[in-house]
Amino acid sequence: MGRINLNSEAERNAYVDRFIDEYGNAEYEYMLVVDSKGDVSLLTSKLPDMIDMTDVDITMKGSYNIHNHPAAETQFSFSDDMDVPYMLDDGTKIMEAFDYKYRYRLEQMDGVTKEQWVEARSQAEENVLSIMQDRGLDLSDYEEYAKHILIEESCRILGKGVYTRWKR
C-alpha cells in the first residue's frame, strides 16, 4: 500500500482516517498495518470475526495496526482471548480497533506474556460486575461495557498497558 514517514503522526493518521472511512461498515475484518520501517499493508481473510495471519509475511514486532470489528461481531472492545494474545505474541507496539460505536487502543504491553495476561484476565473477570456498579452502569449495558472493563482491569492488575476507548 505504500510507506509512511514514521515521524509523521499526521501522515499515519491520514492513512488511518481513510481506512476507517472505507472499512467502517464492512462485513469482514480488515487490518491496516504500519510496520517498524513504515511499510503499510492491508490485510483481510474475508472472515467476519478474525484475520488469519498464518501465511502473512509482515514483521509485526514494533508495528502499529488498526482493524475493524463488523457490527454483527463487535464486543465494543478488543477480544481478550484473540486480539490481545496475538498482540503479545507478535510484539505489536500499538493496536487499535473500531466498531460502529467506539474506537479503542492498547499499547505499552512490552514484556507481558500470554500466561500473565490469562492470569490477570482471570482475576479481572471477578471484578467486572462490581466495577460496573461502582461506575453507576446498568447491568442491561453489560455487553457494551464488559470487555472494555475486563481489558482495562487486566492492565491495572498487570501494572502494564495503556488501554483507552472513546466514542467515534
PLM region spans:
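Low-complexity, glycine/serine/proline-rich disordered segments
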Residues: 1-10
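Active-site-proximal loop/helix of nucleotide/amide-processing enzymes and allied scaffolds
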Residues: 1-2, 50-168
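Short beta-strand scaffold segments in enzyme catalytic cores
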Residues: 28-36, 95-98
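Short secondary-structure junctions
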Residues: 40-41, 164
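A short catalytic or substrate-binding loop motif that flags glycine-/basic-rich loops and adjacent residues
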Residues: 23-27
